[in-house]
């Protein structure tokens, strides 16, 4: 694996000079191998190691290089046709392969090659970009989007119209991460490498970026870029220091543990916030 990484790192340093016409065989094969490993889930752009999320920047570099080495081509999408550098993940799937991999895809859901979809996942008409990782038992609901390199945990529900931000550039930026057993409400947006920790519930229409204040009403603490595990979060506002205006924030209205979450429905958690 180190040799593969070295090829990618070296090629990335001279990426401005690489074109589909002049790319060398070693670089092309290395990039294609990485995309294949991302596609199968054998590699992932970010993973939790010793309780901390670690981003493998060289894998992001490989994804970016894939755009340099490939020309646009006509892609058959069943109901439509596309013209892009990245093939569709399911272009050569037959019924046997869908059965083997064990997920369900509802038309016209679109998944780019280099994204991993785990077993027991349901993709309603949605979009999953290259480098993303969608783990077991997750529902990606209608018109939800999973951005490039985003990491979606087990048993997550991304409701209708949810946007999970992608991150290929700037290179140092970390991907957006939704940990296991989270619920993201309709039309919410989680972007810019924000981490929603395990078991959290995000209400409808909540917008979370790195500059968004995430206010815990029980403690008065303000978080940035991270929703603590087990949080129930709704949209809100915080007053300015001079009291003349207020600015948008997200409010943690309560904390729930796995036992409580298992006994109480999502709707009840969101409706009983007083």
UniProtKB/Swiss-Prot annotation:
GO biological process, one term: diaminopimelate biosynthetic process
Main location as per UniProt: cytoplasm
Gene3D superfamilies noted in UniProt: Hexapeptide repeat proteins, Tetrahydrodipicolinate-N-succinyltransferase, N-terminal domain
Name of the molecule in the record: 2,3,4,5-tetrahydropyridine-2,6-dicarboxylate N-succinyltransferase
Subcellular location: Cytoplasm
Enzyme class (EC, first level): transferase
Species whose genome carries this gene: Salmonella heidelberg (strain SL476)
Reactions mediated catalytically: (S)-2,3,4,5-tetrahydrodipicolinate + succinyl-CoA + H2O = (S)-2-succinylamino-6-oxoheptanedioate + CoA
Pathway named in the protein's UniProt entry: Amino-acid biosynthesis; L-lysine biosynthesis via DAP pathway; LL-2,6-diaminopimelate from (S)-tetrahydrodipicolinate (succinylase route): step 1/3
EC number: 2.3.1.117
Keyword Magnesium: no
GO cellular component: cytoplasm
A GO molecular function held by the record: nucleotidyltransferase activity
Keywords from the UniProt entry: Acyltransferase, Amino-acid biosynthesis, Cytoplasm, Diaminopimelate biosynthesis, Lysine biosynthesis, Repeat, Transferase
Similarity comment text for this entry: Belongs to the transferase hexapeptide repeat family.
């Amino acid at each position: 694996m180190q040799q593969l990484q070295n090829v990618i790192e070296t090629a990335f340093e001279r990426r401005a000079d690489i074109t589909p016409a002049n790319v060398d065989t070693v670089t092309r094969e290395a990039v294609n191998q990485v995309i294949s490993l991302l596609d199968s889930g054998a590699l992932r752009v970010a993973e939790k190691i010793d309780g901390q999320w670690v981003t493998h920047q060289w894998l992001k570099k490989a994804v970016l290089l894939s755009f340099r080495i490939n020309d646009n081509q006509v892609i058959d999408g069943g109901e439509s046709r596309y013209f892009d550098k990245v093939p569709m993940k399911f272009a050569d799937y037959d019924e046997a392969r869908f059965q083997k991999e064990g997920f369900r895809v509802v038309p016209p859901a679109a998944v780019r090659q280099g994204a991993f979809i785990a077993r027991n996942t349901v993709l309603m008409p949605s979009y999953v970009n290259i480098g993303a990782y969608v783990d077991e038992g997750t529902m990606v609901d209608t018109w939800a989007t999973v951005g490039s390199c985003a990491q979606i945990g087990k048993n997550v529900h991304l409701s209708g119209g949810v946007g999970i931000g992608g991150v290929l550039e700037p290179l140092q930026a970390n991907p957006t991460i939704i940990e296991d057993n989270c619920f993201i409400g309709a039309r919410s947006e989680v972007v810019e490498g924000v981490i929603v920790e395990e078991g959290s519930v995000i209400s409808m229409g909540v917008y979370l970026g790195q500059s968004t204040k995430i206010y815990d009403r029980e403690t008065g603490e303000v978080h940035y870029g991270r929703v603590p595990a087990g949080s129930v979060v709704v949209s809100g506002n915080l007053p300015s220091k001079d009291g003349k205006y207020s600015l948008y924030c997200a409010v943690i209205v309560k904390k729930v543990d796995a036992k409580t979450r298992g006994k109480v429905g999502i709707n009840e958690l969101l409706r009983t916030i007083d």
